[in-house]
């Protein structure tokens, strides 16, 4: 996400991060991504902003004009996981709500949804700024080299580099 912040703000990371030196923000780069220079310039020029859910807090831009997610839920993945493992899930069930749970299947759905949504956006009239951070070339790997879905035999974890098999080129 650091390179995303630098790219969206047209500058090197050390320059982009300089104003954050005294920041008390818990996730300082989040603001640099959500309110980037590129987004501001394009929105000021009349572009509509579209953002697709990445499943990664650091690159979610829910404040875009249009935020697209395959799992519309009032809860993020961590909240969903916590709620699903407590008695707080009962009121949700009564209200017909589901706490969105992270997992390999949900990760696959988000990736496929992003590609489908991207294929549909050209049909939307007018100039657009589209932000899509697709977490496919990163662990956990949920597709094999041919694009077939895989279900790893371990607990879902976004930073699981044990999923690397072979060399990096095989995943590109």
Report each predicted region and the residues it spans:
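Catalytic domains that recognize anionic headgroups
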Residues: 1-172
């Amino acid at each position: 996400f650091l390179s995303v912040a630098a790219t969206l703000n047209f500058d090197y990371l050390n320059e982009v991060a300089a104003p954050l030196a005294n920041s008390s923000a818990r996730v300082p780069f989040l603001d640099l991504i959500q309110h980037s220079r590129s987004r501001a310039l394009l929105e000021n020029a009349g572009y509509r902003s579209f953002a697709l859910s990445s499943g990664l807090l650091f690159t979610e831009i829910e404040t875009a004009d249009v935020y697209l997610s395959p799992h519309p839920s009032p809860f993020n993945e961590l909240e969903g996981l916590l709620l699903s493992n407590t008695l707080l899930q009962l009121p949700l069930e009564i209200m017909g709500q589901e706490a969105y749970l992270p997992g390999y299947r949900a990760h696959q759905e988000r990736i496929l949804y992003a590609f489908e949504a991207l294929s549909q956006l050209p049909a939307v009239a007018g100039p657009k700024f589209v932000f899509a951070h697709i977490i496919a070339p990163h662990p956990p790997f949920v597709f094999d080299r041919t694009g077939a879905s895989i279900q790893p035999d371990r607990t879902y974890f976004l930073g699981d580099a044990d999923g690397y098999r072979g060399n990096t080129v095989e995943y590109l």
